[in-house]
């Protein structure tokens, strides 16, 4: 511990990059039991990172919920518009996906352990390539991340979680 008046500067804390998977965005933009935890997770630390895969999966989840009549088309459009507005405001950092990410994902899948779904392998490859910690609500994805020794935080609903807010209008993450 540096004493007052010493010439030593306090060490700056490095900001950890956080890669946000689709399950967290769904909980954030739609009313779900994990909505409040997703909001806290997104606000913690620096600018959260996403990939084009997250953008595509988010739109796909909304479309699936509309087809299953779990979500009104107007609500899906509103969630998508708000997500896009947040992107335009710079509230997310976009991590591009390149050939090296596909190669790494393929190597992990070809190793047969841990069990990996195709798109999960790609999410993990993007996170690993950026040196990012994964924030997810997907238990299987979190298990795979930990098996690959990647930093990961799993959002879980606690016993008392009944809030299902969603579609927040926030000023900043």
Predicted regions and their residues:
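Active-site neighborhoods of divalent-metal-dependent phosphate/nucleic-acid chemistry enzymes
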Residues: 89-140, 146, 169-173
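Structural signal for conserved beta-strand scaffold positions within catalytic alpha/beta enzyme cores
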Residues: 96, 154-156
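C-terminal binding/interaction regions
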Residues: 139, 152-153
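Active-site-proximal, substrate-binding regions of enzyme catalytic domains
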Residues: 56-112
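Short, well-structured N-terminal submotif of metal-dependent ribonuclease cores
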Residues: 2-56, 61, 65-81, 148-150, ...
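Short acidic/polar capping segments at secondary-structure boundaries
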Residues: 139-141, 158-159
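Short gly/pro/ser/thr-enriched loop/turn and capping motifs at secondary-structure boundaries
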Residues: 58, 142-143
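Residue-level detector of short coil/turn "hinge" positions at structural boundaries
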Residues: 72-73, 116, 134, 152
